[in-house]
Amino acid sequence: MGLGIDILKISRISRLIQRSPEWEKNFLKKCLCENEIKKYNLIKSNSSLPRLSEQAKWLAVRWCVKEAVFKALQPNFRVYMSMMEYVRTPTGYPSVVIHDPRFPLSPVMVSVSHEEDLVVANALYLPSMPKT
């Protein structure tokens, strides 16, 4: 079993992605999987959500959740943010899946909350019990 928590200021992510297109691109590669990069680019190009604050919040949630998951999986599993995907279960609960065949892990349960400039996330990893 593993438990992780992280807290992050959304403004920190906002400043980072405003530095330059190259900084933003490198940040996306570091913290998002391919599916999430596609979703982010759709959000960014969507005229109904052009605000930088919404983009930064979307990214901050993923960074914070993945950092909490990273902590929950330590020291047994060395996974990177780009291997993780923040998803919703069929019942609507937030979760993280690991996209790497070397890590046949159960999905990690997460909880995330944001208020004003802060995002907080916690993660709980419960290894699957062997079938008897």
Swiss-Prot record:
Enzyme Commission number(s): 2.7.8.7
Q: Which domain of life is it from?
A: Eukaryota
Positions binding Mg(2+) in this chain are 6, 67
Q: Which GO terms describe its molecular function?
A: holo-[acyl-carrier-protein] synthase activity; magnesium ion binding
List the effects observed when the gene is inactivated: Extremely slow growth at various temperatures.
InterPro entries tied to this protein:
4-PPantetheinyl_Trfase_dom, 4-PPantetheinyl_Trfase_dom_sf, ACPS, Ppantetheine-prot_Trfase_dom
Q: List the disulfide bonds.
A: none
Name the enzyme's class. transferase
| Function according to Swiss-Prot or TrEMBL | Transfers the 4'-phosphopantetheine moiety from coenzyme A to a Ser of acyl-carrier-protein.
Q: Which family does it belong to?
A: Belongs to the P-Pant transferase superfamily. AcpS family.
Task: Tell me what this protein is called.
Answer: Putative holo-[acyl-carrier-protein] synthase
Q: Which organism is it from?
A: Schizosaccharomyces pombe (strain 972 / ATCC 24843) (Fission yeast)
